[in-house]
């Protein structure tokens, strides 16, 4: 079952890559984030309990870092420029 899920995800990502290359587009940050979220959910479903705790902690840490980078740092830089 797990092999079939991974194989279908790999095929799906390959089809997406072909569609992007035909349209002369590349993956955007939002596309990559969606792919990582989907793969993270699949890994969480099929992982043992100890590994699940590590993965959830890592995902929360990366989410905090991403939102800090996207929202808090620009506010801080804008306040430095205004002074």
UniProtKB/Swiss-Prot annotation:
Task: Please give the superkingdom of this protein's source.
Answer: Bacteria
Q: Which UniProt keywords apply?
A: Cell membrane, Membrane, Transmembrane, Transmembrane helix
Name where it's found.
Answer: Cell membrane
A GO CC term assigned to this protein in UniProt: plasma membrane
Database matches in InterPro entries = DUF5510
Does the keyword section mention Zinc-finger? no
**Which membrane topology term applies here?**
Multi-pass membrane protein
Residues crossing the lipid bilayer are: 5-22, 32-49, 56-78
Give the signal sequence positions.
none
Record protein name field: Uncharacterized protein RP098
